């Protein structure tokens, strides 16, 4: 078996030893001399060498040792030059088996003093390719490229130029491009293609195809598109499949304008866009919210006698549902059914999700029943959509029934299912059922996430269960889940409503130390708590603190404070006439009204 390791030593930069003057002149890897054939096929050294190889060669795995132990090979070795090896490859006067010549090349390459040029390796690679030893030929080119490294395409390719008209030269160009590509030297592979055009080689179809495939995985889409246009202009075969792939890549990047250019290029090059071509671009336009272009393409598709398929309708229906254009979505649904197309589960899920989002529960249930009548079975995504729709509508019994039906069908509820139920029951004021669902989650090995914890905390706060809510908050923190602003604010509000503003402020500090920046809503909750306790001085100090850190008070802030000042102006507050203040819009108005309240309070005391 051929091993690159055997030949790798031939590419070293060590100084060669002498076998003969001729071998010394051509013994370096970087030799710029051209390797020419001997003038006479009857060169006695070449004949002796051929006879020695014929008499000593044994089939693998003994091929290498057969030369090492052969006296006739050892005898002719001092007379050999690189020219003789090249002449053996080119002329083969005794018509030796190709494998014996390749085996001898490996042997002689391992001998001190023999360092072949790039051209020599290409000569042998071409010889092997002519005799259909393609794997061995490719391995020689891999050896050349691995030795020369990156940015070597120009210096390596020049060795192929004089071989342009010889048989199998096209194979060598393809193999060289493939080798550079497989080693990740993409610029070198591209340079090989451009040099092949410059020196008028045939288009390296295999090399270009391999390079294009690699670029699809690694390179920016714009670079791939430019290279594809370049090879098409050189004569690379047209393929609408490649255009479709490039369109899809541009669409995924959100670059719809370049995707349109690719689509337009299909017809410019006298190709017919396929249904995949149209669908790719329609879907791209729909994802960026350009429904007009999506429908324009559908019309163009029908005009060109390309029938829209289920995917076409699915993309457009999904876009209509996202824009809450449910009538239009159902119109397309009816159209596709009339054309004999069978809606799939994706389309039904899209419609059901659209109705769920809009709170159209009856239409959601109607679409669900249609789906079942078509023999389609819901997946976990659709079940979760139904559960969410029922929970948002407050129909918790129906939501629970959907989950029970899902379990009977052998589908296990996931985190989204349970979290949606917990949130629904907490919003509905049934925290106990939510806690039971949480236990069910634990039994099934599903951990509660931020949404689930927040729902429980908020639900408990609404019911005034502040101790349980704080316990859930601490559990949330122990699980490594950071509460959001809403959760902290709900906790503060619950404690303040219980008259415990002090704990509310502790939670504020905890919230700030966790990296949160409290909003005006959070401060309003605390201000309301202080005002209800009659701590108006502390409330005004909190207002100043808000202003100092850049939190802008809103109407609720000022009106909460005014209510507090009016209520707690003095113990005889019932005798003070509350000003008709309406909505206070700024700090100056607030201070003016507070001063008015203070004056009224003093006047009352002085009577």
From Swiss-Prot:
Pfam families: PPR, PPR_1, PPR_2. GO terms for cellular component: mitochondrion. Keywords: Repeat. InterPro entries: Pentatricopeptide_rpt, TPR-like_helical_dom_sf. It comes from the Eukaryota. The keyword Repeat applies. PPR repeats lie at residues 239-273, 274-308, 309-343, 344-378, 379-413, 414-448, 449-483, 484-518, 519-553. Belongs to the PPR family. P subfamily. This is Putative pentatricopeptide repeat-containing protein At1g09680. It comes from Arabidopsis thaliana. The lineage of its organism: Eukaryota, Viridiplantae, Streptophyta, Embryophyta, Tracheophyta.
């Amino acid at each position: 078996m051929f091993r690159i390791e055997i030949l790798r030593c031939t590419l070293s930069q060590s100084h060669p030893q002498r076998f003969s003057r001729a071998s010394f002149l051509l013994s370096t890897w970087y030799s710029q001399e051209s390797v020419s054939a001997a003038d006479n096929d009857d060169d006695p050294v070449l004949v002796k060498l051929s006879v020695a190889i014929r008499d000593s060669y044994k089939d693998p795995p003994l091929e290498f040792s057969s030369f090492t132990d052969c006296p006739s090979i050892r005898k002719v070795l001092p007379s050999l030059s690189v020219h003789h090896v090249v002449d053996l490859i080119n002329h083969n006067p005794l018509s030796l088996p190709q494998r014996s010549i390749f085996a001898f090349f490996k042997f002689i390459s391992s001998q001190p003093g023999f360092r072949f040029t790039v051209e020599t390796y290409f000569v042998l690679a071409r010889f092997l390719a002519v005799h259909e030893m393609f794997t061995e030929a490719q391995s020689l080119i891999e050896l050349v490229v691995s030795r020369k490294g990156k940015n070597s395409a120009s210096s390596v390719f020049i060795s192929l130029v004089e071989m342009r008209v010889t048989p199998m030269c096209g194979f060598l160009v393809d193999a060289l491009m493939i080798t550079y590509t497989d080693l990740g030297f993409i610029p070198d592979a591209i340079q090989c293609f451009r040099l092949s055009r410059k020196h008028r080689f045939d288009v390296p179809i295999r090399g270009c195809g391999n390079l294009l495939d690699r670029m699809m995985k690694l390179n920016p889409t714009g670079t791939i598109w430019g290279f594809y246009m370049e090879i098409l202009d050189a004569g690379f075969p047209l393929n609408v499949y490649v255009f479709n792939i490039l369109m899809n890549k541009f669409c995924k990047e959100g670059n719809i304008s370049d995707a349109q250019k690719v689509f337009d290029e299909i017809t410019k090059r006298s190709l017919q866009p396929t249904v995949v071509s149209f669908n790719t671009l329609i879907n791209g336009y729909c994802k960026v919210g350009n429904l007009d272009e999506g429908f324009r393409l559908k019309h163009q598709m029908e005009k060109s006698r390309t029938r829209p398929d289920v995917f076409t309708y699915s993309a457009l229906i999904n876009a209509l549902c996202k824009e809450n254009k449910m009538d239009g979505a159902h119109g397309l649904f009816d159209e596709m059914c009339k054309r004999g197309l069978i809606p799939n589960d994706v389309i039904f899920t899209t419609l059901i999700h659209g109705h769920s989002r809009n709170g159209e529960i009856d239409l959601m249930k109607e679409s669900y029943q249609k789906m079942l009548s078509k023999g389609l079975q819901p997946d976990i995504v659709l079940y979760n959509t139904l559960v969410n729709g029922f929970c948002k509508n407050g129909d918790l019994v129906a939501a629970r029934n959907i989950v029970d039906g899902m379990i009977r069908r052998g589908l296990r509820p996931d985190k989204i299912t349970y979290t949606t139920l917990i949130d629904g029951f907490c919003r509905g004021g049934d925290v106990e059922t939510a806690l039971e669902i949480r236990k069910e989650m634990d039994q099934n090995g599903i951990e509660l996430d931020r949404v689930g914890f927040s729902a429980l905390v908020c639900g408990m706060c609404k019911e005034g269960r502040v101790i349980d809510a704080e316990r859930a908050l601490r559990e949330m923190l122990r699980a490594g889940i950071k509460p959001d602003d809403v959760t902290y604010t709900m906790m503060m509000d619950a404690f303040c409503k219980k008259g415990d503003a002090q704990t509310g402020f502790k939670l504020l500090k905890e919230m700030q130390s966790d990296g949160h920046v409290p909003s005006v809503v959070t401060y309003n909750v605390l201000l309301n708590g202080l005002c209800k306790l009659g701590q108006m001085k502390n409330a005004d100090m909190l207002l100043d603190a808000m202003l100092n850190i850049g939190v802008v008070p809103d109407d609720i802030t000022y009106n909460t404070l005014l209510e507090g000042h009016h209520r707690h102006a003095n113990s005889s507050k019932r005798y003070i006439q509350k000003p008709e203040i309406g909505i206070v819009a700024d700090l100056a108005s607030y201070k003016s009204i507070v001063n008015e309240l203070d004056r009224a309070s003093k006047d009352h005391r002085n009577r």
